[in-house]
Amino acid sequence: MEGYKSFLVFLVSSLLLGFLGVIFTLVWVLHWREGLGWDGGAAEFNWHPVLVTSGFIFIQGIAIIVYRLPWTWNCSKLLMKFIHAGLHLTAFVFTIVALVAVFDFHNAKNIPNMYSLHSWIGLTVVILYALQLVLGVSIYLLPFARDTLRAALMPVHVYSGLLIFGTVIATALMGITEKLIFSLKEPPYSKMPPEAIFVNTFGLIILVFGGLVVWMVTTPAWKRPREQEIKALNPTVSSPDGTEEGSTITDCSNTEKSDVELNSEAARKRILKLDDAGQRSTM
């Protein structure tokens, strides 16, 4: 089960790094900065890095890889779409609050808005993320779009999602560097005080987290098989007339770990065979 174990290593590593990134952000603002608050001061600004890291980076990363979790392959595709969209919506709400915090802080302190490259790219990627969310729900979650349209737009949907995710991480790295340059005076950033080392390490953590997420979602062997393949691999599915035959296709809570591992590995082998034969669509 080499493929399954490799996936688990990547998955656990990414989750640990993502969670560690959130912890690093909290330690940064609570220990070295002014803490958290909502009074128009620096403590309100500190919500910006905390919410961007936890929502726009960590939760978005989970939303991207949720289809790759083998133990969810017995869940219905519709259920997974709701989970995928729900996680993205949660990340978007976090991001909006983060934007409100930084604009509120700037306005309270008479600091100009939207003058840095960080702010330009940051606002652009938020708008693109909102557009991606609206189009994704309209095309893939609501039952109005044709299957041909969904299949045709899937490569664009995947590419734009990964592009947005990578841009978010790059923008976050720009932002934390900008914050350190502005904030560290005695000693300056160039002298590498403990805060600088700590925050630089935080930047490396979210960078590696993003790399692991992209690797997992672009590895063909770890792709969720189509619904027909899942049913073929699972002998206990409901019959066409609706009679019960021990189906787990819509209930993923009772699947044994050994069955998940077996089915996931068999599914990957099936996917690779289809890829080699040129039979598999972009879905």
Curated annotation (Swiss-Prot):
Its EC number is 7.2.1.3. Residues 13-218 form the Cytochrome b561 domain. It comes from Xenopus tropicalis. Heme b 1 binds at H48, N113, M114, Y115, S116, H118, E178. It catalyses: Fe(3+)(out) + L-ascorbate(in) = monodehydro-L-ascorbate radical(in) + Fe(2+)(out) + H(+); Cu(2+)(out) + L-ascorbate(in) = Cu(+)(out) + monodehydro-L-ascorbate radical(in) + H(+); monodehydro-L-ascorbate radical(out) + L-ascorbate(in) = monodehydro-L-ascorbate radical(in) + L-ascorbate(out). Residues 234-263 are annotated as: Disordered. Signal peptide: none annotated. Fe(3+) binds at H106. Its main location: membrane. This is Plasma membrane ascorbate-dependent reductase CYBRD1.
